[in-house]
Every structure is written in C-alpha cells, then in structure tokens.
C-alpha cells in the first residue's frame, strides 16, 4: 500500500531546521546583506530540503514593507552567496545546499478561501 503523503527523512528535517535558524539569525543581524533588506522585516515560513540535500527551498513572507515581492526576491538573490557562506559555517556537511527563495502564497490563498466562503 502506497503512502498518500510524502515524508521527509530525519536528515532533511534536521538540515531544514538548521537552515531556518541560520536564515533567521543572518536576517536579524543584517550584515553582508543587500541594503534593501535592512528595512524589510521577513518571516521565514518554511524550509524544504530536497532528498539529495543539495537544494533548500526557503519560503518567506514580508511584513509592512514598501518593497515589491520582485524587489525582495532580487535583494535576497543578491545576498545569496553571503547567506550560503553563513549557513556553510553552521552545518557540518561535505556540500552546502543551494538556497532558493520563494514567496509563500499560503496566506494569500487562505484569504481567498475565506472570501469565497464568506460569499456563499
């Protein structure tokens, strides 16, 4: 019998947790980051690591910012090398995963569903 949900290994979950903590720390410090991120509070909503541990998909949600999502994505991608170096120092692995940033549409989708249910 096949499982309906995809489970993540212990190593994936552990690495995702370490990356999440490191992202929070480097965003809080703000050193070596793109200057546009200084006045842009971000929440890291989740980190998903691929099964081969080579890619970490990091989902974020901005709060009270004048920047567009594209500007935030550009600033995060400009800071990707500094973030990856910081994470490399936190983990004890042969390879450091490639960090990929994604806007988390979960809250937008929840609002849309709430409006649809309200209209019923």
From Swiss-Prot:
Q: Which domain of life is it from?
A: Bacteria
- Homology family: Belongs to the RbfA family.
- Coiled-coil positions: none
Could you tell me which Pfam families the record lists for this protein? RBFA
What name has this protein been given in UniProt? Ribosome-binding factor A
Alphabetized SUPFAM superfamilies for the sequence = Ribosome-binding factor A, RbfA
Q: Where in the cell is it found?
A: Cytoplasm
Alphabetical list of Gene3D superfamilies matching this protein: 3.30.300.20
Q: Please give the NCBIfam families that the UniProt record associates with this protein.
A: PRK00521.2-2, rbfA
Q: Which PROSITE patterns match?
A: RBFA
Gene Ontology biological-process annotations: maturation of SSU-rRNA
Q: Which UniProt key words apply to this protein?
A: Cytoplasm, Ribosome biogenesis
InterPro entries registered for this protein in UniProt:
KH_dom-like_a/b, RbfA, RbfA_dom_sf, Ribosome-bd_factorA_CS
The GO terms describing molecular function are: ribosomal small subunit binding
Quote the subunit structure annotation.
Monomer. Binds 30S ribosomal subunits, but not 50S ribosomal subunits or 70S ribosomes.
Gene Ontology CC: cytosol
Q: What does this protein do?
A: One of several proteins that assist in the late maturation steps of the functional core of the 30S ribosomal subunit. Associates with free 30S ribosomal subunits (but not with 30S subunits that are part of 70S ribosomes or polysomes). Required for efficient processing of 16S rRNA. May interact with the 5'-terminal helix region of 16S rRNA.
Q: What is its main location?
A: cytoplasm
């Amino acid at each position: 019998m096949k499982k309906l949900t995809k489970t993540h290994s212990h190593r994936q979950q552990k690495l995702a947790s370490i990356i999440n903590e490191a992202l929070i720390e480097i965003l809080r410090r703000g050193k070596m980051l793109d200057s546009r991120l200084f006045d842009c509070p971000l929440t890291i909503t989740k980190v998903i690591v691929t099964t081969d541990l080579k890619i970490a998909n990091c989902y974020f949600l901005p709060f009270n910012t004048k920047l567009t999502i594209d500007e935030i994505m550009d600033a995060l991608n400009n800071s990707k090398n500094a973030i990856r170096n910081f994470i490399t120092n936190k983990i004890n692995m042969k390879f450091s995963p490639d960090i990929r940033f994604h806007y988390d549409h979960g809250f937008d989708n929840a609002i849309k569903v709430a409006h649809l249910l309200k209209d019923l």
